[in-house]
C-alpha cells in the first residue's frame, strides 16, 4: 500500500472511533434518560445496565453510515486545508486514488454493519425483550401505582386503592381479558402480589369474581381466598407467536419468508424490514463515496474552505432522506422496495462517476 494511503487511513480510523463513541453515547444517553424512572421502581443497577446495553447494536446499525461520512469529510477537509491533498493532486494522483483510503475504511465498516444487521441486531432484541419481561415480572409490585389503572400485561389491568408495607394491597380490582370469550373482573378487599419461581401471582382475600359466559350471562363467585397467576412473558419467550414478535427480533432469512399465518400488512412490514437490513449497511460505503466525490470536485480556495463540506453534507442528507421516505412507503407497498435499491444504485453510480471523471 502506498504511503499516503496508510497515512490517510491512520488519520481516519482514530477519528472514526472517537466520533462513533461520541455520537452513539449522546444518542444512547437520551435513551437511558427515558428509563431512569425504573430506579424509582427499585430496579438494580446491574439489571438496568444489562437492559440499556442491549440498545447499542440498534444505534450503531442506524448511525454508522452518518458517522463514517463525518469522519471522512473532516479528515479530507483538514488535508485540503493543510494543502496535502493539493500536493498529491499536482503530483498526478487522481480523485479515485485519493478516495481509496476512505473507501477501504468504508468497506470495512460496511462488513461490520452487515454482521450487526444479520446477527447482533436480532439477537440483542431477543435478549432485550427477555430482559424487559424479567424486569416487568420481578419488579411488578413496585411498578403498580395507587389509584391508577395499571396495565400489567397485554390482557390484564389492575387497580389498587392503597399499598401498605409488606407488599400488602387494599381495594384491588383486576380486569382479566386473557380469554376474550369470557372476560372477568375480580374485586378483593386485600391481597398481596408475590413472585414464585419468577411467576407473579396475586393472592387475594375476601372478594368477588364476575364473569360473562359465551351467551352473555353474568356469573358471580364470592371467595375468601383466591390465587391469580399472571402470565409470565419471560417463560414464553421461546413460544412467542409470529404475531407477537417484533420485526427486530427476526433474522433476515426469517423476514424474507414470513409465516403464512400472518396478516398481509404484517408480512409486508417484515419483508420491507428485511430489505432495510440489506440496503442500509451498503450506505456505509455509498455515502462516503458520494460525499468524497462531491468534495474532491471542488478546487481549493482559502475563502470557501467550508463550501465543499457543506455541499457534500447536503448531498448525503438528501440521499438519506429519500431512502427513509421510500422505506416508509415500502413498509406499506412492496413495490417501493425497487425504488429503495434504485436510489442506492443512483447514488453509488453518481459517486463513482464523479470520482473517475475529471472536472472540465
Curated annotation (Swiss-Prot):
Can you tell me where the transmembrane regions are? Answer: 12-32, 52-72, 96-116, 278-298, 306-326, 336-356
Q: Which GO terms describe its biological process?
A: lipopolysaccharide transport
> What cellular-component terms does GO give this entry?
ATP-binding cassette (ABC) transporter complex
Which cellular compartments is it found in? Cell membrane
- Which residue pairs form cystines in this protein? none
| InterPro entries noted in UniProt | LptG/LptF_permease
Q: How does it sit in the membrane?
A: Multi-pass membrane protein
Please provide the record's keywords in A-Z order.
Cell membrane, Membrane, Transmembrane, Transmembrane helix
What name is this protein filed under? Uncharacterized protein RP871
Amino acid at each position: 500500500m502506498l504511503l499516503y494511503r496508510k497515512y490517510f487511513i491512520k488519520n481516519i480510523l482514530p477519528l472514526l472511533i472517537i466520533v462513533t463513541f461520541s455520537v452513539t453515547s449522546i444518542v444512547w444517553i437520551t435513551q437511558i434518560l427515558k428509563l431512569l424512572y425504573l430506579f424509582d421502581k427499585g430496579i438494580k443497577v446491574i439489571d438496568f445496565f444489562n437492559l440499556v446495553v442491549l440498545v447499542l447494536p440498534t444505534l450503531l446499525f442506524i448511525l454508522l453510515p452518518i458517522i463514517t461520512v463525518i469522519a471522512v469529510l473532516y479528515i479530507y477537509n483538514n488535508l485540503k486545508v493543510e494543502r496535502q491533498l493539493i500536493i498529491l493532486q499536482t503530483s498526478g494522483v487522481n480523485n479515485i486514488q485519493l478516495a481509496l483510503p476512505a473507501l477501504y475504511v468504508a468497506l470495512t465498516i460496511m462488513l461490520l454493519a452487515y454482521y450487526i444487521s444479520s446477527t447482533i441486531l436480532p439477537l440483542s432484541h431477543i435478549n432485550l425483550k427477555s430482559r424487559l419481561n424479567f424486569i416487568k415480572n420481578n419488579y411488578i409490585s413496585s411498578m403498580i401505582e395507587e389509584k391508577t389503572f395499571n396495565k400489567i400485561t397485554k390482557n390484564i389491568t389492575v387497580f389498587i386503592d392503597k399499598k401498605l408495607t409488606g407488599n400488602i394491597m387494599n381495594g384491588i380490582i383486576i380486569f382479566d381479558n386473557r380469554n376474550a370469550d369470557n372476560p372477568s373482573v375480580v374485586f378483593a378487599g386485600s391481597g398481596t402480589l408475590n413472585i414464585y419461581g419468577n411467576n407473579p401471582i396475586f393472592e387475594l382475600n375476601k372478594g368477588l369474581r364476575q364473569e360473562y359466559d359465551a351467551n352473555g350471562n353474568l356469573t358471580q363467585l364470592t371467595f375468601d381466598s383466591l390465587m391469580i397467576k399472571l402470565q409470565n412473558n419471560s417463560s414464553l419467550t421461546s413460544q412467542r407467536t409470529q404475531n407477537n414478535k417484533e420485526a427486530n427480533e427476526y433474522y433476515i432469512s426469517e423476514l424474507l419468508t414470513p409465516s403464512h399465518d400472518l396478516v398481509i400488512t404484517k408480512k409486508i412490514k417484515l419483508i420491507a424490514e428485511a430489505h432495510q437490513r440489506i440496503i442500509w449497511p451498503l450506505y456505509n460505503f455509498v455515502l462516503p463515496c458520494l460525499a468524497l466525490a462531491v468534495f474532491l470536485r471542488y478546487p481549493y480556495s482559502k475563502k470557501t474552505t467550508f463550501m465543499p463540506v457543506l455541499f457534500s453534507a447536503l448531498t448525503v442528507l438528501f440521499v438519506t432522506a429519500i431512502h427513509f421516505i421510500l422505506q416508509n412507503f415500502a413498509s406499506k407497498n412492496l413495490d417501493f422496495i425497487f425504488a429503495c435499491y434504485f436510489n442506492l444504485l443512483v447514488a453509488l453510480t453518481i459517486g463513482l462517476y464523479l470520482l473517475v471523471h475529471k472536472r472540465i
